[in-house]
Amino acid sequence: MPRLILLRHGQSQWNLENRFTGWVDVDLTDRGEAEAAKAGALLAEAGFRPAVMFTSVLKRAQKTGAAALAAAGLGDTPVIADWRLNERHYGGLTGLDKAETAAKHGEDQVHIWRRSYDVPPPPLAPGGEYDFTTDPRYAGQPIPDTESLKTTLDRVQPYWDAEIAPRLKAGEDVLIAAHGNSLRAVVKLLFAVPDDKIVGVEIPTGNPLEITLDAGLKPTAARYLDADRAEALPVLP
């Protein structure tokens, strides 16, 4: 049975600063780099040897995955990066301090933007500091100017169906090094988590989530490799 590892990037600089990051290409902190290395040790301990790593185009995910693979002695694993595994686009909240945003707009409104399934933040204004339309990584792509978790899932699912699922169905083990919300989307797909429950699923930084799948890609077992930093998992479908 194929195994899938979901690995959220290690702590980033803006995680530390409590800012809405989204698609901004911030780096890992020293703690984030240590989390990535520990993730690799856990992969080695679990005997996990992925045929491929899928990741986003953002360096905090790419560096986490690469460091984990290197620490596991798997540095030659093929890597495929795609923007559809990026973090959720936080629109007009991008770059803002979360506490200051709550003080300005009210905690209830910010909670809705952050934790509702289908309500996106205000769109990102064009031409500003965080306008991604001129970034060559997204040239010719229909990139959003804001996203909810639902619309994040809407871009993750076609990529999953076309690129990731076929590798698993072929019996290959796969690593996905990505972000809290793009990985939530994968968890929702696999575990059929209801809309009102998926927003409460927490995925800790740098802790590999191992999911064992049957031939139809239905989860048969799931566990965090670092039990001391584990979060609650959805019920197996």
How would you label these PLM feature ranges?
Residues 39-129, 188-212, 216-219, 235-237:
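Phosphate-coordination/substrate-recognition cap region in phosphate-metabolizing enzymes
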Residues 180-185:
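GST superfamily/GST-like fold recognition
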Residues 1-5:
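Extreme N-terminal starter segment of soluble prokaryotic enzymes
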Residues 55-56, 176-178:
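Short beta-strand scaffold positions
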Residues 121-148:
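Glycine-rich phosphate/pyrophosphate-binding loop
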Residues 9, 84, 179:
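Active-site glycine-centered loops adjacent to acidic/histidine catalytic or metal-binding residues
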Residues 155-170:
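Phosphate/ATP-binding catalytic cores across multiple sugar-kinase/actin-like superfamilies
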Residues 11-71, 142-158, 200:
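Loop-to-helix element that buttresses phosphate recognition and phosphoryl-transfer chemistry
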